């Protein structure tokens, strides 16, 4: 109870007191309660927003409140909270939008390396850049793998030889490199033609969903997850990173997560595409 009443920075200092304090402060339930009860300065503890200036879109991460001082040795960058607007804006046009999973936020500025922000502990992790020059042009999937008990980033793109390839990065691995994935079985289920994934992704219950445009404007909703789905193409793969489902639907608009609060592994969730004339709703379920 006392720890919950401490300001965020003072509470984090207590992590060094003992292993018991460390376990309590790092537990998801404590972080959730602290965020809910924290009303310091009347500001939200973690807020990601954007504003338009000329033709560019600028993202500001309010919870960082300072500039990042990066070093070659540091994998995790500590973020001070003394200044609100000193963090440089992230300028982007259309390639990538920030996405979140389990309280973590993944963002990237065009061809630069991605960053994962932890607003509760005020830490930033720089993700290594990928070797293929075409990889950064496609969005990243970001979600929690319950089997591996870690967050993973997945990247799927098409090479100049029109081959669909994928790489995975695990935040909990000691090896800080992207791993190549064999998605030949998943790629064979896709219609023939050029594949372009949108930057609109959401994560619900172990799935990462995003839209893909194939050849002459035909669109579908693709997902990578740890469970199979009731509709669409079902591919029998056991690994979270290798399961891909394609929904053959003509879509338009933006992929939006309605709500993920209180979802369990057996829950169904609604994904909605808001188009100019109608709404498309998908109900993925566990089977």
From Swiss-Prot:
| Protein name per Swiss-Prot or TrEMBL | F-box protein At5g48550
InterPro entries, alphabetically? F-box-assoc_interact_dom (IPR017451), F-box-like_dom_sf (IPR036047), F-box_dom (IPR001810)
User: Can you name the source organism?
Assistant: Arabidopsis thaliana
Q: Which residues form the F-box domain?
A: 1-36
Q: Which Pfam families match?
A: F-box
């Amino acid at each position: 109870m006392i720890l919950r009443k401490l300001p965020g920075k003072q509470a984090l200092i207590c992590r060094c007191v003992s292993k018991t304090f460390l376990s309590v402060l790092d537990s998801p339930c404590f972080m959730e309660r602290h965020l809910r009860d924290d009303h310091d300065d009347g500001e939200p503890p973690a807020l990601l927003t954007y504003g338009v200036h000329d033709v560019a879109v600028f993202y500001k991460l309010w919870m960082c409140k300072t500039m990042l001082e990066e070093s070659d040795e540091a994998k995790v960058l500590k973020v001070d909270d003394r200044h609100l607007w000193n963090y440089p804006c992230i300028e982007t046009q259309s390639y990538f939008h920030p996405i979140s999973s389990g309280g973590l936020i993944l963002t990237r500025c065009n061809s630069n390396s991605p960053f994962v922000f932890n607003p509760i502990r005020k830490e930033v992790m720089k993700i290594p850049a990928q070797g293929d020059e075409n990889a950064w042009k496609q969005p990243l999937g970001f979600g929690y793998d319950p089997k591996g008990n870690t967050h993973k980033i997945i990247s799927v793109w098409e090479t100049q030889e029109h081959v669909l390839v994928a790489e995975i990065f695990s935040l909990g691995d000691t090896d800080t490199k992207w791993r190549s994935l064999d998605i030949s079985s998943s790629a064979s289920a896709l219609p023939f033609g050029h594949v372009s994934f949108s930057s609109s992704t959401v994560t619900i219950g172990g799935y990462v969903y995003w839209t893909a445009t194939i050849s002459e404007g035909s669109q579908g909703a693709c997902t990578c997850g740890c469970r199979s789905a009731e509709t669409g193409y079902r591919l029998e793969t056991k690994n979270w990173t290798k399961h891909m489902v394609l929904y053959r639907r003509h879509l338009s608009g933006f992929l939006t997560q309605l709500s993920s609060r209180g979802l369990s592994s057996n829950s169904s969730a609604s994904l909605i595409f808001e188009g100019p004339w109608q709404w498309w709703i998908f109900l993925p379920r566990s089977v």
